């Protein structure tokens, strides 16, 4: 059997890992649309919580209190459709909204509604999950295990395009530049919104989220696929662009 561009004979692990990551990201993304569509109309009011906190688990949770309409986080929940408790939903919908509660601010003005129900996460996070799905598919299509995360990450590009980077030994810089291109727009948009009076818009949140999600999914799959044991722990057996060789220091 002819060897691949990394010196191995197959991409079984790369394909399997990427299918798993894509299924998780894509599955949750799909549920974010299905849950509000299937729930009774008006079941989820306008929310406004905190990231990395459970704000709407029960009727007595933080998000269901009166924090004032001018508060930087939270609002007067009674003025926005009443209380919401995702623990009272069926197990699947509870997982979808509970995960969103923990990971997202769930600000209603930054979220979409379906069937009169606010979606579990904001539009930025919708973009991120879509990007994670796309990034996993990208690495599953092109990526190779090349021992290190940086070399595996860059394997998505054609070897001939990588030759100048390998000849100059700028692989780490190249990877960081690509990641920066993906994360930069979201960071600028998000931090500008947080630190100034600027307010982004949902289409821009989606686009910057997608760009960030792509490089996150791409890097994550690279990290999971970069394994030395498939080369017999022999760095000399790894094929790299420009006939470069890995050496252990």
State where each predicted segment sits.
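Mid-length scaffold segments of soluble, non-membrane domains
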Residues: 112-152
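Membrane-interfacial, low-structure loops and terminal tails that flank and connect transmembrane helices
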Residues: 1-11, 146-172, 232-249
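Membrane-water interface of alpha-helical transmembrane segments
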Residues: 11-22, 169-179, 199-202, 206
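Hydrophobic secretory-pathway targeting helix
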Residues: 1-44
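Hydrophobic cores of alpha-helical transmembrane segments in multi-pass inner/ER membrane proteins
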Residues: 131-136, 210-226
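Extracytosolic (periplasmic/ER-lumenal) interhelical loops and adjacent juxtamembrane/interface segments
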Residues: 41-119
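Interfacial helix-loop-helix junctions of multi-pass membrane proteins
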Residues: 42-46, 110-120, 187-212
């Amino acid at each position: 059997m002819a060897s691949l561009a990394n010196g191995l004979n197959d991409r079984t692990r790369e394909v399997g890992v990427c299918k798993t990551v894509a299924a998780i990201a894509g599955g949750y993304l799909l549920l974010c649309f299905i849950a509000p569509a299937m729930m009774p109309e008006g079941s989820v009011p306008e929310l406004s919580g905190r990231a990395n906190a459970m704000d709407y688990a029960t009727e007595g949770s933080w998000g269901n209190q009166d924090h004032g309409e001018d508060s930087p986080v939270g609002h007067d929940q009674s003025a926005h459709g009443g209380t919401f408790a995702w623990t009272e939903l069926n197990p699947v919908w509870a997982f979808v909204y509970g995960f969103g509660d923990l990971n997202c601010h769930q600000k209603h003005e930054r979220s979409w509604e379906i069937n009169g129900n606010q979606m579990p996460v904001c539009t930025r996070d919708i973009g991120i999950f879509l990007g994670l799905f796309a990034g996993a598919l990208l690495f599953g299509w092109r990526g190779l295990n090349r021992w290190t995360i940086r070399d595996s990450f860059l394997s998505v590009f054609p070897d001939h395009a990588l030759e100048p980077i390998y000849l100059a030994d700028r692989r780490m810089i190249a990877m960081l530049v690509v990641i920066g291109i993906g994360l930069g727009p979201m960071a600028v948009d998000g931090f500008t919104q947080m630190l100034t009076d600027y307010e982004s818009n949902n289409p821009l949140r989606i686009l910057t989220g997608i760009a960030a999600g792509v490089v996150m999914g791409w890097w994550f799959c690279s990290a999971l696929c970069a394994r030395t044991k498939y080369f017999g722990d022999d760095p000399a057996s790894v094929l790299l662009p420009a006939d470069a060789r890995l050496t252990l220091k």
